[in-house]
């Protein structure tokens, strides 16, 4: 059976920077309050860029980085909870924009774990078919589902997109996954969709649930446990000691979650790459944005051992062990 490796990365974030100080002018908060509780200093917010645009720009970068053509792609998966349309899918729209005429395309919704889920689905599809190359994108326009009057949530989120290209290779690359879901606790992180109204049914149930709602304490507890479980499982499957792992690239939600997880794992927090201070929580986009940033900075070398780990609404969580191949 063929191995699967990451051969290219890309990302896009809006130019519009929203600082903590600016947010303190629209809600009752402060830079000190946000910074000490989350580690976030600023975030990028769309001024017209939609999910399709951001996903497309990240895809173009990844294609260029992988030194391939768009028509080499056999599969496009977009992980998003903020699509522009119910149909066509974001993936089909990206296909149109980049000219990937040979690709099978679809979206998945797994919130902040979406990129990890997308990688696992893509690996399975590549290994068990004629397909050779896949484009996985995490893209979010979270600013449109944030309640800008809720100081507990509006300070957390940002917009952006990140992408990775996978390919069948001779050398080892993507090694092991650990992915789980816990719908029993889904009520702790929610966002409503359409009101359940038609001419036969008038229902006000969803009218007050069109924005992100979060039980911060429960999500914090869940996140630390989920990240720890995932990393322990990946260690067991790969037989890696954490001292061998160059970086852990986690979902960029909150610096305190990462710090508590590092303590639980008895490892230095510096092993966890963090860029949430600049971008905030970009949900499914956070891991691929971080991965692309590291790739561009030259922080990763061939055969480096890295672990990606995500957690989010659903509740969902998962991770993957990778031998870096670029």
From Swiss-Prot:
Keywords: Acyltransferase, Cytoplasm, Fatty acid biosynthesis, Fatty acid metabolism, Lipid biosynthesis, Lipid metabolism, Multifunctional enzyme, Transferase. Residues 252-256 are annotated as: ACP-binding. It is found in: Cytoplasm. Its main location: cytoplasm. One of its GO terms (cellular component) is cytoplasm. CDD domains: KAS_III. Pathway: Lipid metabolism; fatty acid biosynthesis. Its EC number is 2.3.1.180. The active site is at residues 112, 251, 281. Homodimer. This is Beta-ketoacyl-[acyl-carrier-protein] synthase III.
């Amino acid at each position: 059976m063929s191995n699967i490796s990451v051969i290219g990365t890309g990302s896009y974030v809006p130019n519009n920077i929203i600082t903590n100080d600016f947010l303190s002018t629209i809600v009752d908060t402060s830079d000190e309050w946000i910074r000490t509780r989350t580690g976030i200093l600023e975030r990028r917010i769309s001024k017209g860029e939609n999910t399709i645009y951001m996903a497309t720009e990240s895809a173009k970068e990844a294609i260029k980085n992988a030194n391939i053509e768009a028509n080499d792609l056999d599969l496009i998966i977009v992980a998003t909870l903020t699509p522009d349309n119910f149909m066509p899918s974001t993936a089909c729209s990206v296909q149109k924009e980049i000219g990937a005429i040979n690709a099978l395309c679809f979206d998945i919704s797994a919130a902040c774990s979406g990129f990890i889920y997308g990688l696992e689905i893509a690996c399975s599809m590549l290994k068990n078919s004629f397909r050779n190359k896949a484009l996985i994108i995490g893209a979010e326009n979270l600013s449109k589902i944030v309640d800008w009057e809720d100081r507990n949530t509006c300070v957390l989120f940002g917009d952006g997109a990140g992408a990775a290209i996978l390919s069948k290779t001779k050398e080892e690359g993507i090694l092991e996954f650990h992915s789980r879901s816990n719908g029993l606790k889904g009520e702790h992180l929610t966002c409503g969709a359409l009101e359940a109204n038609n001419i036969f049914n008038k229902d006000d149930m969803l009218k007050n649930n069109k924005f992100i709602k979060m039980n911060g304490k429960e999500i914090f507890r869940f996140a630390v446990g989920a990240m720890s479980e995932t990393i322990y499982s990946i260690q067991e499957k790969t037989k890696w000691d954490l001292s061998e792992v160059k970086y852990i690239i986690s979902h960029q939600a909150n610096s305190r979650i990462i710090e508590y997880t590092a303590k639980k794992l008895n490892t230095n927090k510096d092993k966890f790459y963090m860029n949430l201070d600049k971008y905030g929580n970009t949900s499914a986009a956070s891991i691929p944005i971080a991965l692309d940033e590291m790739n561009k900075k030259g922080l990763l070398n061939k055969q480096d051992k890295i672990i990606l780990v995500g957690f989010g609404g659903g509740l969902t969580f998962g991770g993957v062990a990778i031998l870096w191949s670029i």
